[in-house]
């Protein structure tokens, strides 16, 4: 789901697909014209575009580009029907969260800037927290500006990542 700078983001997605990424499934890029109303609107829109047969879904924040595939696999390994799987890094909740299809209806109605946290708060009894290996200390860096990105790259280089 794109919003701000949608054309630039879509262009970069296209480049990545051509150069290095391979997907076994179809990838859809959806523009959220209401993106300024908060990330909840993007989560809601994305949920409405999920394949009907999907069992669960991640919402991976676009401003956290260092989330590792290993983290995704570890989260998926702990998924069970009717759960919300939240990764922990060093005991702290992190991204991305894996939502079972049971929560799609709630997710599709989100508004505001809390995003999936609204659904998490509503369904505490369905939460499964999982400590993930998190080999990359930068995987939950929140990059909101080009300066944040440059700083993260410098720090990663200094630490040998």
What is the predicted function of each stretch?
Residues 62, 94, 106, 138-139:
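Short, flexible active-site loop motifs that bind/organize anionic cofactors or intermediates
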Residues 109-161:
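Conserved alpha/beta core of the MobA/IspD/sugar-nucleotide pyrophosphorylase nucleotidyltransferase superfamily
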Residues 95-99, 141-143:
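Short glycine- and hydrophobic/aromatic-rich loop-to-beta-strand nucleating segment
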Residues 1-62, 66-93, 125-134, 154:
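Nucleotide and nucleotide-moiety/phosphate-recognizing core
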Residues 72, 103-107, 149:
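A generic structural signal for short hydrophobic patches within well-formed alpha-helices
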Residues 53, 107-110:
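A polyampholytic, Gly/Pro-enriched intrinsically disordered region
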């Amino acid at each position: 789901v794109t919003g701000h700078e949608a054309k630039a983001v879509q262009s970069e997605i296209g480049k990545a697909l051509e150069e290095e990424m391979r997907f076994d499934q179809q990838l859809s890029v959806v523009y959220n014209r209401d993106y300024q109303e908060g990330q909840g609107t993007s989560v809601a829109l994305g949920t409405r575009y999920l394949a009907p047969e999907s069992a669960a879904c991640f919402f991976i924040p676009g401003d956290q580009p260092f989330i590792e595939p290993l983290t995704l696999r570890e989260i998926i390994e702990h998924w069970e029907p009717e759960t919300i799987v939240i990764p922990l890094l060093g005991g702290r909740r992190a991204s991305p969260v894996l939502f079972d299809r049971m929560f799609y209806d709630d997710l599709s109605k989100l508004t505001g800037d809390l995003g999936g946290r609204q659904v998490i708060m509503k369904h505490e009894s369905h939460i499964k927290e999982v400590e993930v290996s998190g080999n990359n200390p930068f995987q939950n860096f929140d990059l909101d500006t080009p300066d944040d990105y440059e700083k993260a790259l410098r720090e990663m280089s200094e630490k040998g990542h």
